[in-house]
């Protein structure tokens, strides 16, 4: 009799323990993936893998605060290459990826929260190169380097400019500096950070041809309530000036 009572008490204790652990944890958690895309998201040590507090940048700071306010659990990992992390977020429930451009052709692939940043699309040339462009049509006469899987490279490919796509955008710095390409299609201010990391200067803007906003893209299975809660908190952060303050920390 006493043994049965003892076992029953153990069972009740286990149930209470499980309940307490559940109450202490956020009811929903996500796996967030990103890449080196300064100043929006980047590894503190500049390498191609980082986790949690070793990831820096405007968007990384904004996303962390947004999830904290929304009381949604998350892990954050920076990996390489970009098309791999993009594919994981596209295919795996509970995953998200940032920072990515919200293009019309991507609209129905994800659920979106943002914007978490904005940037310009530019064509760079060497400062000693007399290239001067007034349209993308003129750029077709030149060798253009771009980043594989990036919105800029995708758009130029669609337009028939046939950019040479690199797995690492930083490789385009070397190629432009050495004359292997004539133009580098890249984001501004992204290129300024990458060039500084490589210790290279001597580039100029040959054409500024678009502006775009950056988002957190969530797997389509993400509950609408989670998306709405994140967006509500981001909107509140923007109204408070929190997002502008985050941007100013990296200028």
How should these model regions be labeled?
Residues 77-138, 149, 205-207:
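Acidic, polar ligand-binding/catalytic clefts
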């Amino acid at each position: 009799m006493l043994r049965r009572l003892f076992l029953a008490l153990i069972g009740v204790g286990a149930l209470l323990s499980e309940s307490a652990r559940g109450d202490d944890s956020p009811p929903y958690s996500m796996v967030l993936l990103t890449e080196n895309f300064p100043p929006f998201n980047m590894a503190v040590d500049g390498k191609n893998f980082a986790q949690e507090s070793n990831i820096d940048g405007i968007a990384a700071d904004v996303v962390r605060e947004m999830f904290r306010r929304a009381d949604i659990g998350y892990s954050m990992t920076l990996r390489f290459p970009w098309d791999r992390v993009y594919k994981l977020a596209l295919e795996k429930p509970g995953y998200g990826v940032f920072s990515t451009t919200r293009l019309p052709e991507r609209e129905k692939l994800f659920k979106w929260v943002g914007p978490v940043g904005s940037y310009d699309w530019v064509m760079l040339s060497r400062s000693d190169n007399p290239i001067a462009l007034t349209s993308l049509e003129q750029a077709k006469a030149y060798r253009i380097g771009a980043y594989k899987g990036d919105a800029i490279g995708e758009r130029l490919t669609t337009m028939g400019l046939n950019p040479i796509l690199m797995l690492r955008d930083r490789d385009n710095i070397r190629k432009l500096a050495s004359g292997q390409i004539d133009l580098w299609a890249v984001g501004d201010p992204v290129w300024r950070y990458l060039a500084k990391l490589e210790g290279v200067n001597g580039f100029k803007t040959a054409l500024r041809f678009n502006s775009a906003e950056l988002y957190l893209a969530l797997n389509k299975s993400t509950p609408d309530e989670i998306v709405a809660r994140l967006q509500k908190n981001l909107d509140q952060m923007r109204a408070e000036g929190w997002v502008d303050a985050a941007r100013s920390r990296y200028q």
